[in-house]
Amino acid sequence: MLHKTSRFWPDELAGFKKGLGDIAHHDFLTLETLSTRFMRVGKEPPLRGTVIMLGARNYLLFTMGYVPYFRLYPGQRIPRPLEIVEHHGHSTAQEVCREILALTKLNWNSCAFGSSLPITIRFARHVGKILTEMPVGVTPQTKYKFYM
């Protein structure tokens, strides 16, 4: 599974598929945080894990929201859903959403229950911020441990 926050160019998508070689099962996703907020009847926001199908390969996923097990919403504002804008691959929407939800809880540098973005996007943004502060001419470290 490959996550991006920008749309796939046709040549880029072809390159990723070519790079797969013999790997048959793949999913390439474009994820965007939607600015629209949704409400549900009652006083709690939508449930974490709620999926709204917009099309066969386009859907909304609430990665933040009310968690019945804890009987609370671990956030401060009305949650915004994550929109799966593009989905190129073999998995069902349910499988993709389940995996994204799991990846929102995979930040070992935080004690939070989960985050709005999967670690694949969140960590890439974190490293990107660090790299923008590097002086010109310095070769960046390639090992993960330098960015924890």
How would you label these PLM feature ranges?
Residues M1-M148:
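Long, contiguous domain-sized segments
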